[in-house]
């Protein structure tokens, strides 16, 4: 979320005047934040970006805890505050559970989060946006954590071995600045929607 927070702060601080929005506050909630802070943020928010998630757990059960249970807590806080602001969920192409992603525990947890968001939107008349991210690369991506490109570049630059599991696999990539542009467009109410084989993204 650092790239999004930086972009929003640049708009707030008038360093970026190219956008057709005003940003007064940027609330950041993470593992160190309190449930009281979450309630306060959910009372005042005009738009919620849920970028929380677990992608490198110690136990498989942590996928559901981080990718579903927090989403449920977040949506419940919005519901309790009667806040019907738009909500955006960062999901993954693995949620399709097709091809090389079939049976992915990570994908299952992301799909469960998507279904929760869509149900919340239908029940509460809220605009819900779900973005299924492919492999991201760019500023602040971390090797051996959240970016295959960062890992590849890090290993090459440091003379470390690289691993290619299947040379025939086409890797889907998204540059972080392009993603941030779309997220700001969504904040402005200019989101892009697409549908892929029984899936709306």
Regions found by a protein language model. Name each.
Residues 1-57:
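N-terminal Rossmann/SDR dinucleotide-binding element
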Residues 33-73, 77-81, 94-101:
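NAD(P)H-binding glycine-rich loop region in Rossmannoid oxidoreductase-like domains
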Residues 115-140, 154, 160-169:
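Conserved beta-loop-beta element that borders a ligand/cofactor-binding pocket
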Residues 72-114, 121-124, 128-131:
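Conserved Rossmann-fold NAD(P)-dependent oxidoreductase catalytic core, especially the SDR/UDP-sugar
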Residues 64-68, 103-111, 142-146, 173:
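Short-chain dehydrogenase/reductase
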Residues 151-174, 186, 191-198:
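A conserved pocket-lining segment of Rossmann-fold NAD(P)-dependent short-chain dehydrogenase/reductase
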Residues 103, 134-144, 166-174, 197-200:
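Glycine-rich "substrate-gating" loop/helix at the edge of Rossmann-like oxidoreductase active sites
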């Amino acid at each position: 979320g650092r790239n999004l927070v930086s972009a929003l702060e640049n708009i707030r601080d008038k360093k970026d005047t190219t956008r057709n929005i005003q940003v007064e506050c940027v609330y950041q909630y993470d593992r160190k934040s309190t449930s009281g802070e979450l309630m306060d943020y959910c009372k005042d928010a005009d738009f919620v970006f849920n970028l929380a998630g677990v992608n490198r757990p110690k136990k498989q059960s942590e996928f559901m805890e981080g990718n579903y249970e927090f989403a449920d807590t977040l949506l419940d806080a919005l519901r309790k505050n009667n806040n019907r602001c738009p909500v955006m969920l960062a999901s993954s192409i693995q949620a399709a559970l097709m091809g090389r992603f079939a049976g992915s525990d990570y994908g299952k947890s992301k799909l469960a989060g998507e279904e929760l968001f869509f149900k919340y939107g239908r029940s509460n008349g809220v605009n819900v946006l779900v973005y299924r991210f492919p492999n991201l690369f760019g500023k602040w991506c971390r090797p051996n954590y959240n970016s295959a490109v960062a890992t590849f570049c890090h290993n090459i630059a440091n003379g470390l071995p690289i691993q290619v599991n299947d040379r025939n696999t086409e890797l889907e990539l998204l540059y972080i600045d392009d993603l941030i542009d779309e997220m700001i467009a969504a904040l402005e109410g200019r989101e892009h929607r697409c549908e892929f084989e029984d899936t709306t993204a």
